[in-house]
Amino acid sequence: MAKRGGRVAPPPRRGEWELRFGESEAATGWEELCRQAPGPLREAWDVLSRDPRDRTNPSRQHRLRSDLGTRAIRGKMLEQWQYEVTGAERIWFCPDDSIRVVFITKASTGHPSETD
């Protein structure tokens, strides 16, 4: 829910995907990423809103493996992907094709220990 003084997110352009938080912790992590890496995070926003499954740069953007590769969001099992914002900073997200929404499930300023 938007609050006075809160950040305003642009609506998606025609053909683009909408980005939403799938977890409260992701919203907190997103704000930290905004402070630490605003330029690379804006690039991530642009890429994810255009094509969340873009495979142009697989070292930066790829589907997570094994148990991390799917996640339940709103009662649906969705693919879970990772976008490398910087060397250590990551975003995990789940695209929902039926509503063209990318759910941000993790936004981390450090390398997620789950992938070690």
Predicted segments, located by residue:
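Basic, Lys/Arg-enriched alpha-helical interface segments
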Residues: 1-89, 95-116
